[in-house]
C-alpha cells in the first residue's frame, strides 16, 4: 500500500469536492459527470505510453461504459443523476483496485490504484451524501 498515493488522493478528493459543489436546487451540473467521463483517458494514455495496444483496446471497451454512465447521469433528474454518479465513482474505485485482476496495462504506474481509487471512493461517498440531502429536501417540500 502506497501511503503517499493514498494521502495525495485524499487531499485531491477534498479539494475537488470543495471546488465542485453541487447546487442544492435546479439541474445536475456537468462537473461531476464530465470528471467521471475523463477517467478512462488516463488508462488510455498509460496504454499508449507503454505501446500496449491490446491493453488500449480493452481500456477503450471498458471506458465506453464510464463515458456512457456519465452521459446518462447528466441527462437524468438531479437525484437519479447523483445516484448514478455515486455508482460510477465507487464502481471506478473498485475498477482501479481490481484492474490488474482483469488485465494488465503495463503503462499504469504502481501507485495509481491507490491514488485514483481513493479519489473515486471519496467523491462517490460525497455524491451519495449530496443525493441523500437532495432526496431529504425534496421529500420535505
PLM segments and residue spans:
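Membrane-interface helix-boundary motifs at transmembrane edges
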Residues: 20-32, 51-54, 75-79, 133-140
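Membrane-helix boundary connector in multi-pass membrane proteins
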Residues: 76-83, 87, 95-112
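N-terminal signal-anchor/start-transfer transmembrane helix
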Residues: 6-25
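Hydrophobic cores of alpha-helical transmembrane segments in multi-pass inner/ER membrane proteins
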Residues: 9-15, 65-68, 118-130
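Hydrophobic transmembrane alpha-helical segments in integral membrane proteins
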Residues: 1-12, 52-55
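Cytoplasmic-side transmembrane-helix entry/capping segments in multi-pass membrane proteins
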Residues: 26-38, 58-62, 82-91
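Juxtamembrane "helix-exit" motif on the non-cytosolic side of transmembrane helices
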Residues: 19-24, 45-50, 97-105
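A loop-to-helix transmembrane entry motif
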Residues: 47-64, 113
Amino acid at each position: 500500500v502506497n501511503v503517499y498515493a493514498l494521502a495525495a488522493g485524499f487531499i485531491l478528493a477534498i479539494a475537488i469536492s470543495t471546488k465542485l459543489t453541487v447546487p442544492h436546487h435546479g439541474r445536475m451540473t456537468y462537473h461531476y459527470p464530465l470528471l467521471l467521463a475523463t477517467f478512462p483517458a488516463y488508462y488510455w494514455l498509460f496504454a499508449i505510453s507503454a505501446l500496449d495496444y491490446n491493453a488500449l483496446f480493452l481500456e477503450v471497451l471498458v471506458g465506453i461504459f464510464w463515458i456512457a454512465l456519465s452521459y446518462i447521469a447528466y441527462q437524468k433528474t438531479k437525484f437519479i443523476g447523483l445516484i448514478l454518479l455515486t455508482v460510477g465513482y465507487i464502481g471506478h474505485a473498485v475498477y482501479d483496485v481490481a484492474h490488474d485482476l482483469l488485465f494488465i496495462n503495463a503503462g499504469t504506474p504502481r501507485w495509481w490504484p491507490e491514488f485514483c481509487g481513493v479519489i473515486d471512493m471519496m467523491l462517490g461517498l460525497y455524491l451519495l451524501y449530496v443525493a441523500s440531502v437532495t432526496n431529504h429536501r425534496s421529500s420535505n417540500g
